[in-house]
Amino acid sequence: MILYLASGSPRRAELLQQIAVPFTVLPAPSIDETPRSAEAAVDYVRRMAREKALVGQARMPTPGAVLGADTAVVLGDQILGKPADDTEALAMLTQLSGTSHQVISAVCVCSEGRQAVRHTVTTVQFRPFEAARLEVYVATGEGRDKAGSYGIQGLGGALVESLSGSYSGVVGLPLEQTVELLEWADIPYWQID
C-alpha cells in the first residue's frame, strides 16, 4: 500500500525516512488552523492532524493511506503556533525562557475508509536566556516555520535544559505512535533496499 505524507514539513519527511518507510509527499494541506472556543490543546492538535490527513486523502492520486500530523507548543493554557514574524518569535521565546512547557504532537492515518489518531505530550524545560541571546537565535531564522519559534533538532537544542517524553514528537512526528498507526494500517517500515 502506498503511504502519502500530507505535510510540507521536511522534518516529518526525515523522521519517516529514519524508520525506512516508503512514502510520497502530498502538497501541504491548507486548512483553517484556528483553535475553537474552549477547545483543549490536545483536542486541537488531534483535530488538526485528522483534518490534514482527510484533506490529503481527498488529493491522493492513487489509492493508499495518508498520514497527517500536527504539533503545538503549549504554555499554561496558551497555544503557541508558528510565529508570524521575528518580533512574535522573540516574544514567544521570551515567554518560554526559564520555564517548562508542553509540546503536543498528534499523528493521524486514514486508510481504506478508516482513521486513527494518536498523540504525545512532552514536557520541555527551557534554560533561562537574556533577550540579547534570544535575539541572536531569532536572527538565525531557524524557528520561523516552527511551533513555539524553535527547532530542538537544530540550533534551538541549546535552548533546552531537559525534556520528558518524545523527542521525535517535539521535532514534529512522534515515532512510537507513528509506528503503531503504520502497523494498524498494515504499512511496512524498515524497508531497506
Curated annotation (Swiss-Prot):
Q: A single GO BP annotation from the record?
A: nucleotide metabolic process
Which UniProt keywords are given for this protein, alphabetically ordered? Cytoplasm, Hydrolase, Nucleotide metabolism
Q: Which Pfam families match?
A: Maf (PF02545)
Q: Which GO terms describe its molecular function?
A: dTTP diphosphatase activity; UTP diphosphatase activity
| Enzyme Commission identifier(s) | 3.6.1.9
Where does this one sit in the cell?
Answer: Cytoplasm
Which cofactors does this gene product need? Answer: a divalent metal cation
Q: Where is the active site?
A: D70
According to UniProt, residues marked as the site described as Important for substrate specificity are R11, T71, Q153
What cellular component terms from Gene Ontology apply here? cytoplasm
What is this protein for, i.e. what is its function?
A: Nucleoside triphosphate pyrophosphatase that hydrolyzes dTTP and UTP. May have a dual role in cell division arrest and in preventing the incorporation of modified nucleotides into cellular nucleic acids.
Family membership noted in the UniProt record: Belongs to the Maf family. YhdE subfamily.
Indicate what this protein is called per its UniProt record.
Answer: dTTP/UTP pyrophosphatase
Species of origin reads Alcanivorax borkumensis (strain ATCC 700651 / DSM 11573 / NCIMB 13689 / SK2)
Starting at the broadest rank, the lineage of the source organism is: Bacteria, Pseudomonadati, Pseudomonadota, Gammaproteobacteria, Oceanospirillales
